[in-house]
C-alpha cells in the first residue's frame, strides 16, 4: 500500500472535496453483521438515530463549518457497495467461516443508499438525526461520527504551515511507536483496531493500522474497519452492539418481553450465525441485571465484552459469574474495549494473565491521540466523547442504561422507568473522556 504524506495532504487545501468517507465499507464490521440480522428479522422497524455530544463543553457547531459538514454528509449519500466490495464480502472468510453473508442479503445490500439526514444548530451544537427503516438507517452511525471528528481535526489544523504540520505528525508517529514498543513486552497479547468512529482522520487510522501490523505482528489480530481489512488483508473483527437490545426493549409490549429483550437478541444472533461470533455485550441495561437474570445457556457462549465499567472491575464481575455457573474462566474470553490507553491495556493484561483469555479493542487512544504533539495547545486536537445512538424505534423511546450513568441515553422519564425495572446495582459514575 502506498504511503501518504499526511502532513502534505492536510496542508494542500486545493481540492474541491476531499471525501472523509470513501466507501460504505469504511465502517465497523459489526454494523454489517447486525445489518444482516436487522434485514432478516426487523425489516419493517423504523428508527431514529441521534448525534449526542457528551463533551458538552465543546461547541461543535462553532468549530465545524455547516456547509462543509453538509457536503461530507451529502457525499456519503452518493456511495454504494462496489462490485469489488461485494465480491470480497461474498468470498472472504470471517472468523474462519465462509459465506457469512447470505446471497439474498448481499443482493439487497448492493442497491443500498443511505436515507436523508436532518441537520440544525442549537446552543453551539449540531442536532443531527437520521430517520427511516432500521436496515437503511443504521449504516449512518459510523460515517456520521467519523465525519464530525475529522472535520474537527481539519478545522484545528487549517491555519498551520506545512512544516508545523509535519512536526505534529512526526511527533504523533513517535508517540504511537512508543506505545507499540510497550505492547511488544506483553507475550501472547491480542489486540485489534476499534478506532474508526472517533479517529483523527481516515489516513491517520490507516497509518496506525499499518504501524501495528508491522510493529507487533501476530499480536495485532485485525481491525473493525471493513475497508481497511479488505485493503490491508487483515481480519475484520467485531460482533454486536447495544442497538440490538435497545430496539428489542423499545418494541417490548409487556414486562416479560422487556425482561427477555437482551436474551432474545442473543438467541436470534446464535441462530443466524450458527454458533459463531458468540460474544455477549452485557451492559445495555446494566451488567449486574444482565447476569442476575441470564439463562444458563449464556454461560456457554465464548465470552463477554465488558464495555462501560472499569476493565478490571468489569472483568472480575464476569469471571465471578462464570465460576458461579460452573464454567472455567480460563476457557473463556474477555474483550476489553472501553476508552483504553496503553497503561490500561498493560494493567488489565497483567491483572488477568493466566486467569482468562483476553483480547483488546483499541479505539480513540489509538487513532486520535495528538495530545502534546502540537507546538502549542490546540483544543480541536483533543478527542471528544461523541456517539450516535438509536433514540426511537417505531415511535417508542429507546434507552441505554450502561454501567456508567454518564453514558446513559434516552428520555429522562424512560431512563428512570428502565432503572426501576432492571435496577441500578453496581452502576458507578466515572469520567467519560472518549
UniProtKB/Swiss-Prot annotation:
Q: Name one Pfam family in it.
A: NAPRTase_N
A single GO molecular-function term is:
nicotinate phosphoribosyltransferase activity
Does Iron-sulfur appear among the keywords?
A: no
Its pathway is: Cofactor biosynthesis; NAD(+) biosynthesis; nicotinate D-ribonucleotide from nicotinate: step 1/1
Q: Which PANTHER family match?
A: NICOTINATE PHOSPHORIBOSYLTRANSFERASE
What GO biological process, any one, is recorded here? NAD biosynthetic process via the salvage pathway
Q: Which family does it belong to?
A: Belongs to the NAPRTase family.
- Tell me what reaction this enzyme catalyses: nicotinate + 5-phospho-alpha-D-ribose 1-diphosphate + ATP + H2O = nicotinate beta-D-ribonucleotide + ADP + phosphate + diphosphate
| PTM text | Transiently phosphorylated on a His residue during the reaction cycle. Phosphorylation strongly increases the affinity for substrates and increases the rate of nicotinate D-ribonucleotide production. Dephosphorylation regenerates the low-affinity form of the enzyme, leading to product release.
The top EC class is ligase
**Ranges that cross the membrane:** none
What cystine pairs are annotated?
none
Q: What is this protein called?
A: Nicotinate phosphoribosyltransferase
Q: List modified residues, type Phosphohistidine.
A: 242
| Enzyme nomenclature, EC number | 6.3.4.21
Keyword annotations for this protein, in alphabetical order, are: Ligase, Phosphoprotein, Pyridine nucleotide biosynthesis
What cellular component GO annotations does this protein have?
cytosol
Q: What does this protein do?
A: Catalyzes the synthesis of beta-nicotinate D-ribonucleotide from nicotinate and 5-phospho-D-ribose 1-phosphate at the expense of ATP.
Amino acid at each position: 500500500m502506498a504511503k501518504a504524506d499526511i502532513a502534505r495532504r492536510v496542508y494542500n487545501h486545493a481540492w474541491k472535496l476531499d471525501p472523509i468517507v470513501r466507501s460504505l465499507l469504511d465502517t465497523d464490521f459489526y454494523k454489517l453483521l447486525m445489518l444482516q440480522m436487522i434485514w432478516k428479522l426487523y425489516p419493517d422497524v423504523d428508527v431514529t438515530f441521534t448525534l449526542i455530544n457528551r463533551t458538552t463543553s465543546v461547541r461543535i457547531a462553532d468549530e465545524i463549518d455547516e456547509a462543509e459538514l453538509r457536503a461530507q454528509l451529502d457525499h456519503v449519500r452518493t456511495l454504494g457497495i462496489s462490485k469489488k466490495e461485494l465480491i470480497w464480502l461474498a468470498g472472504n472468510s470471517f472468523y474462519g467461516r465462509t459465506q457469512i453473508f447470505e446471497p439474498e442479503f448481499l443482493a439487497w445490500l448492493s442497491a443500498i443508499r443511505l436515507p436523508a439526514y436532518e441537520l440544525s444548530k442549537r446552543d453551539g451544537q449540531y442536532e443531527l438525526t437520521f430517520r427511516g427503516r432500521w436496515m437503511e438507517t443504521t449504516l449512518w452511525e459510523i460515517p456520521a461520527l467519523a465525519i464530525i471528528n475529522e472535520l474537527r481535526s481539519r478545522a484545528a489544523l487549517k491555519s498551520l504551515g506545512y512544516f508545523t504540520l509535519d512536526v505534529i505528525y512526526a511527533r504523533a508517529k513517535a508517540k504511537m511507536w512508543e506505545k507499540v514498543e510497550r505492547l511488544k513486552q506483553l507475550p501472547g497479547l491480542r489486540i485489534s483496531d476499534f478506532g474508526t468512529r472517533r479517529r483523527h482522520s481516515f489516513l491517520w487510522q490507516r497509518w496506525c493500522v499499518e504501524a501495528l501490523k508491522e510493529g507487533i505482528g501476530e499480536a495485532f489480530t485485525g481491525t473493525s474497519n471493513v475497508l481497511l481489512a479488505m485493503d490491508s488483508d487483515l481480519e475484520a473483527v467485531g460482533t454486536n452492539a447495544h442497538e440490538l437490545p435497545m430496539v428489542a426493549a423499545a418494541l417490548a409490549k409487556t414486562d416479560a418481553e422487556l425482561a427477555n429483550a437482551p436474551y432474545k437478541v442473543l438467541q436470534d444472533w446464535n441462530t443466524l450465525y450458527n454458533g459463531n461470533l458468540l460474544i455477549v455485550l452485557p451492559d445495555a441495561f446494566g451488567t449486574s441485571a444482565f447476569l442476575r437474570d441470564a439463562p444458563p445457556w449464556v454461560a456457554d457462549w465464548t465470552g463477554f465484552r465488558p464495555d462501560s465499567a472499569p476493565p478490571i472491575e468489569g472483568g472480575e464481575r464476569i469471571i465471578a459469574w462464570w465460576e458461579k455457573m460452573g464454567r472455567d474462566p480460563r476457557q473463556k474470553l474477555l474483550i476489553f474495549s472501553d476508552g483504553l490507553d496503553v497503561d490500561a491495556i498493560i494493567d488489565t493484561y497483567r491483572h488477568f494473565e493466566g486467569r482468562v483469555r483476553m483480547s483488546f479493542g483499541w479505539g480513540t487512544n489509538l487513532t486520535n491521540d495528538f495530545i502534546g504533539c502540537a507546538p502549542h495547545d490546540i483544543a480541536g486536537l483533543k478527542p471528544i466523547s461523541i456517539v450516535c445512538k438509536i433514540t426511537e424505534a417505531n415511535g417508542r423511546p429507546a434507552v441505554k442504561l450502561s454501567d456508567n450513568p454518564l453514558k446513559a441515553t434516552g428520555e429522562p422519564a424512560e431512563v428512570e422507568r428502565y432503572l426501576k425495572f432492571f435496577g441500578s446495582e453496581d452502576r458507578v459514575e466515572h469520567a467519560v473522556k472518549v
